[in-house]
Structures are given as C-alpha cells and as structure tokens.
Amino acid sequence: MQDLKTYLSTAPVLAILCCSFLAGLVIEINRFFPDALTLTFPSFEFFSSP
C-alpha cells in the first residue's frame, strides 16, 4: 500500500490528473457556451463602464 501512495503522489501522475481535470472543464464549458471567446454572465456588470 505504501508503494501505491508513493506512486500516486509523484509529479507526473499529479500533472496528468490536473491536466485531465482542466481539459474536461474546458470541454464542458465549451459544451454549454459554444463559440464563446470570453465567459460573460449578466452578473459581471462591474467590468463594464457606466
């Protein structure tokens, strides 16, 4: 069991998990908001000028 914990805590495994999560997140955002260059919601009105 100690060997499995050591393997799962190595940098390449953690990097692959992080990249896979981010890729899945980007895919899901593009599924719900297709062709959006920026993610804009109506509640983000503090970015616009008055």
From Swiss-Prot:
InterPro entries: PSI_PsaJ (IPR002615), PSI_PsaJ_sf (IPR036062). One of its GO terms (biological process) is photosynthesis. One of its GO terms (cellular component) is chloroplast thylakoid membrane. Keywords: Chloroplast, Membrane, Photosynthesis, Photosystem I, Plastid, Thylakoid, Transmembrane, Transmembrane helix. The keyword Thylakoid applies. It is found in: Plastid, Chloroplast thylakoid membrane. It is a single-pass membrane protein. The chain crosses the membrane at residues 7-27. The keyword Metal-binding does not apply. Coiled coil: none annotated. May help in the organization of the PsaE and PsaF subunits. Belongs to the PsaJ family. This is Photosystem I reaction center subunit IX.
